[in-house]
Amino acid sequence: MWRLKIAEGGNNPYIYSTNNFVGRQTWEFDPEAGTPEERAQVEEARENFWRDRFLIKPSSDLLWRFQFLSEKKFKQRIPQVKVQDGEEITREIATTALRRSVHLVSALQASDGHWCAENSGPMFFVPPMVFSLYITGHLNAVFSAEHCKEILRYIYCHPNEDGGWGLHIEGHSAMFSTVLNYNWLGKLGEGRDGGKDNACERARRRILDHGSATAISSWGKTWLAILGVYEWDGCNPMPPEFWAFPTFFPIHPARMLCYCRLTYMAMSYLYGKKFVGPITPLILQLREEIYNEPYDQINWSRMRHLCAKEDNYYAHTLTQIILWDAIYMLGEPLLKRWPFNKLREKALKITMDHIHYEDENSQYITIGSVEKPLLMLACWHEDPNGDAFKKHLARIPDYVWLGEDGIKIQSFGSQVWDTSFVLQALIASNLPSETGPTLEKGHNFIKNSQVTQNPSGDFRRMFRHISKGSWTFSDKDHGWQVSDCTAESLKCCLLFSMMPPELVGEKMGPQRMYDAVNVIISLQSKNGGCSAWEPAGAGSWMEWLNPVEFLADLVIEHEYVECTSSSLQALVLFKKLYPEHRRKEIEIFILNAVRFTEEIQQPDGSWYGNWGICFLSGTWFGLKGLAAAGKTYYNCTAVRKGVEFLLQTQRDDGGWGESYLSCPKKIYVPLEGNRSNLVQTALAMMGLILGGQGERDPTPLHRAAKLLINSQTELGDFPQQELSGCFMRNCMLHYSEYRDIFPTWALAEYCKLFPLPSKND
C-alpha cells in the first residue's frame, strides 16, 4: 500500500536540503502497510473514479486524505446541516457548516505544518520523465513495478473518447500529448495493440488519421528527436550560441521569462549536441508505428513548421519562420565548420555552466517538471556517472504524486501557496479555541519555508533576481521566488503577529519581514503591476517569437492582476504595522498598484485571471486588492463594475460556473448545462462581500451560502468538480485543495459579515 512521507530525505547521499526537508512530500510503496479495510477503501476510490472518469476528470486526491484521517483517527462529530427551500439561513446553520469544514481541514494538516495537494493536470508531464529515465537506463531503478502500475492507471484513466489525450485532462485531444503518451506506453511494456480498452491501437489510429507524428508541435519534435523516433533535421534551430551573446543583444535569453529561459537552455544544449538516446529495437518499432510513410523516406526539413491544427493555439508568425529558416539554412551549416565550430563549443560550455548553476540553486529540484528531465539529460550526457546526474535522480520523487487515478508528475508542488490560503481561511473562521494548534504548526511551516539567501555567487551574471526574503510556490529548497507567494505568506506572518503568541507561536522577526517587502517592491513594474518571478521589462514584441504553438505569453515576464493584488494587500497590512519602514516607497507602490488594477479591468467589469479560471478568479483578486487599498462600491468605479459583473453572472441556484475555455478564448464562457462550480462560487461570493454587497442587498450572498452549505459532504469537505487553475493562457492545472480552501474561506467571511438570526430568535 502506498504511504505519503512528509519532510523526509531518506538515506540517499546525493540529496540535501536548506531546511531539513520541511515541505517535502514523497510517496513510497509499502507492501505490508494498511489494514484490509484501508486497502478496500483505496480500491473503492479507484473503481469510483474509473466509473465516472468522463464526468469528473480531476481526481478528488483521496489517497493521502485517507491516510492522514486514519492516522489521526478523525471522525466528523458535528452533524451535517442543510438549508431547505424557503428556509432562512440561521447563525447556527452557517457556523455549524463552517466548523465542520474547519475541523476536517485541520485534520488534513501534515506533520510539518503544510497542506498536501495534487498540482498537476497537463498530460505532457509524465512522458518526458519516462523518456529521460529510459534513455539513461534508470527507468526500472527509479520506477518500480508498483510505480509503473500506477503510471499506467493514470494514462488509462484520462484518454478522451476518440482515443487521444488532451493537453490537459479536460482538454480536447492534442497531437502533442497523444504522441508522447503513445511512445511512453511502449517504454512501460505495452505493445502495439496493447493497453486497457485497446488504448494503444486507438491512440495510434488517431495519430495516423490526423497527419502522423510529423504534425506534432515543436516541443514534441524535440523530445521525439531526443528519443530517436524523429530527426533533428525536422526541428527548428535552438542554437546555444544565444547564451554566448552579450546581454544587450535584443533577444538574449536573459530577457526571457525564467520558465522559457530554462526550458530552452536545456533544449539548446541537447540541440547543439544533436543528442539522441540509444536506438533500441523498441525505438525502431516506434518509428514504424507513428508515421504514414516509411521513416527513411520522410523529408524532415519540410516537417519543421508543420503543426496539427488542434495543437496550434499560437500560430508561428512570418517573422519567426523567416528567422528560423535563415538560421537553419545559413547559420547551422556554418557552425558545423571550422572556425565557427569553436563558437559552438564555447556556447555549449557556457550553456552547461548555466545548467549546473540552476540545478545547484534549486537543490536539483529545478524550476519545474517541464525542465527537470531536460536538465537531467544534459547532466547525464556530460557525465553519466557524475554527481550532478545522481543528484537529479534523488529529486525525482519530489515530482511524483499519487491519486485514485494513478501516478502523475506534478508541476512541482503547491505546498506554500496552498498553505498560505488555508491559514488565512482558518484565521477568518475566528475559531481560535478550535484551530490554535493547527495555526501554530502552519505558522512554523511558513516561517521555515522563507528563502533566506539570494542565489549563490554573482547571481546577476547568471540572469537571476534576488530571492532573499521570498517564498516559493512549493518549498524552500525549490528556491525560486514568486511575488504572490511571497505576499500571501507575508500576510500570514503579519496576521499571526497580531495574535497571541501563546496561541500561534512567536512572530517572525522584523528583518525577515523587511526582506520580504524588499522582494515584493522589486517586482513592481513602471505601470504599477507586479510580475511573478523576475522584473518585467523586455519588449512585448518578443512574444512574436513564441516558439510554443500551444501556449501563449510565455516568452517574457508580464504583470498579473493576481500578483499585483496579493502584493498590494500585503504591503497595505505591512504599512499599518510598520508605518515607518520605506514609507514613501510603499505609499507609491500602493498608488501605482491601484492604478494598474483599475486600468486592466475588462469592459464588463471583470479581471482576466492568469493563474485561475478565469474571470471569476481574476475578479476576486481585483476586488480584494482594491478593497485592501480602501476602495469601495461608493468611491471606486472599478469596484462597482466588478460587483455588477458578479451579479450578472450568478446562476439560478445561487452559484457561479465558468468554463476553462474562458482562458484561451479571453472571453467569459459559462459552464455547459448551467452548472455551478463551488470553488468559483466561493470566490465570487467573497468578491461580493469585498464589494459591500451585504450592506445593499445580501440576497445574492444568502443564495450562494445556501449552495455551499447544501453541497458540503457528510465528512465535512466539498465535492471535487472541474479544474480550477491555468497557466500560459491555454493549459489547465488541478489544484485539488481548492475545493476545501475557498468554500471554507467564503463561509468564514459570510459568518463574519452578518449578524444572522438564531433559530431561537
UniProtKB/Swiss-Prot annotation:
Molecular-function GO term, any one: beta-amyrin synthase activity
Keyword annotations from UniProtKB, A to Z: Isomerase, Repeat
Reactions accelerated catalytically: (S)-2,3-epoxysqualene = lupeol
Pathway info: Terpene metabolism
GO cellular component: lipid droplet
Active site: residue positions: D484
Gene Ontology BP, a term: triterpenoid biosynthetic process
Matching Pfam families: SQHop_cyclase_C, SQHop_cyclase_N
Source superkingdom: Eukaryota
Enzyme Commission numbers on file: 5.4.99.41
PFTB repeat residues: 148-189, 639-680
CDD domains: SQCY_1 (cd02892)
Family per similarity comment: Belongs to the terpene cyclase/mutase family.
Annotated NCBIfam families: squalene_cyclas (TIGR01787)
Function: Oxidosqualene cyclase that specifically catalyzes the biosynthesis of lupeol.
Identification of the protein by name: Lupeol synthase
